[in-house]
Amino acid sequence: SYAMTGWRIGYAAANEQIAKVMSNYLSHSTAAPCSIAQKAAVEALIGPQDTVDTMTSAFEARRDHLVERMNRIPGVSCLKPEGAFYIMMNLEQLVGKTLHGVFIRDADDFADAFLKHGLVATVPCTGFGAPNFVRWSYATSLQNIDEGLNRLEKFLAE
């Protein structure tokens, strides 16, 4: 849309009772978004929407390319996300193996080894309750995505 990921701002339509519960939860779990994010969100809602379609199409193309290509790499897989800017790469088949001298117990081990030896940063999903998954962002160019996938193939082959 307006590329405001990470700003932690949004809105919801709910009945009064649910809205009250949501408000109570938010007031105890997080502070209000900064004033700049609030103003930007208003402008994104009332501003031109043609760029939203353009950006959505670009993200879909990168997502589809990443998913299709990753699912051809032996040892890893991913599902096609419906509303994110990243995929969750399943590395369950790599758990218990040694890659570049590193015994892979979970996503943390994989992410550390891949960063050190493949020079690609991924986010381990251990903290999200998914110890056999790492996140790959597709909020970048197709060229960068392909370079990352090329490095993954090389990393897994050596």
Describe each model-derived feature in a short phrase:
Residues 1-158:
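PLP-dependent class I/II
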